[in-house]
């Protein structure tokens, strides 16, 4: 069964090289939706994933409802297993063939893949080297918040083989029935990681593109309105982050990271 990943992007030239090099090894096909990028994002997509599609979004403002409508329209064009991820989100499993085989074995049409929020530890950052494109990003950071109870906050993304995902805005809920995929397979969401000037600039550029509805939903507080506000938020979240190398499920996913 065909495996397709779909993703919107806007000025993602910092994370896209890692994201594309990671996911082109897992998925047969990718549909990348450009929301008016003015940097090298499109060029990077064509360079690192020349066999994937790059399309222009018909929505230049960032609006969660319109984004999900557009995504579901595209999902209806393809068959097989489908997943929709943001550029911050990296799907990880031990063995791709075994993972997709297990989806058939379990007999469901939709699965929730648990999400780990990657957040650097401000007391540990001096031990991290500057991120390099020659090494997978998922192998360069190992601090985050593990979804011990993923039902709190719906800490997951969906993979499914329905006509479309029947998502509610934000894509953490679906009108389809689904089960949580419990084997060591996760979405690593680089939320406040790697925490550097490039990541700050990436977050701050999104706020001015929010639609009126996005502002009413309070998304400007999610992406930040100044570097100072982001640094305060990072300090708060950094106190919650854990060294994932001590987590047994994470160890199964990344055995090289055992402390």
Regions found by a protein language model. Name each.
Residues 28-36, 57:
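Short beta-strand/loop segment that forms part of the nucleotide-sugar
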Residues 4-6, 30-31, 53:
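A structural signal for isolated positions on well-ordered beta-strands in alpha/beta enzyme cores
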Residues 64-73, 92-259:
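Catalytic-site signature of metal-activated, phosphate-bearing donor transferases
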Residues 35, 85-87:
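Active-site acidic Asp-centered loop
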Residues 28, 80, 88, 109:
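Conserved acidic residues
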Residues 18, 40-85:
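Active-site-proximal specificity loops/subdomain of glycosyltransferases
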Residues 24:
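Gly/Ala-rich phosphate-binding loop of Rossmann-like dinucleotide-binding domains
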Residues 2-21, 36:
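Active-site beta-to-alpha loop of glycosyltransferases that engages the nucleotide-sugar donor
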């Amino acid at each position: 069964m065909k495996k397709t990943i779909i993703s919107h992007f806007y000025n993602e030239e910092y994370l896209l090289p890692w994201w594309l090099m990671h996911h082109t090894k897992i998925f047969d096909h990718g549909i990348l939706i450009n929301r008016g990028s003015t940097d090298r994002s499109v060029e990077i997509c064509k360079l690192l994933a020349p066999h994937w599609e790059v399309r222009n979004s018909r929505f230049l403002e960032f609006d969660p409802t319109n984004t999900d409508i557009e995504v579901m329209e595209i999902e209806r064009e393809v068959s097989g297993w489908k997943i929709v991820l943001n550029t911050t989100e990296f799907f990880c499993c031990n063995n791709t063939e075994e993972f997709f085989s297990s989806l058939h074995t379990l007999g469901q049409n939709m699965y929730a893949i648990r999400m780990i929020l990657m957040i650097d530890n401000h007391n540990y950052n001096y031990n991290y080297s500057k991120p390099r494109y020659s090494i997978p990003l998922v192998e360069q950071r190992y601090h985050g918040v593990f979804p011990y109870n993923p039902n709190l906050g719906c800490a997951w993304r969906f993979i499914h083989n329905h006509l479309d995902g029947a998502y509610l805005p934000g894509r953490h809920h679906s009108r389809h029935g689904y089960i949580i995929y419990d084997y060591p397979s996760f979405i690593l969401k680089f939320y406040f990681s790697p925490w550097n000037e490039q990541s700050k600039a990436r977050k701050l550029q999104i706020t001015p593109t929010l639609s009126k509805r996005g502002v009413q939903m309070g998304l400007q507080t999610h992406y930040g309105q100044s570097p100072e506000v982001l640094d305060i938020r990072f300090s708060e979240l950094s106190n919650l982050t854990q060294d994932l190398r001590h987590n047994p499920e994470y160890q199964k996913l990344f055995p090289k990271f055992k402390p």
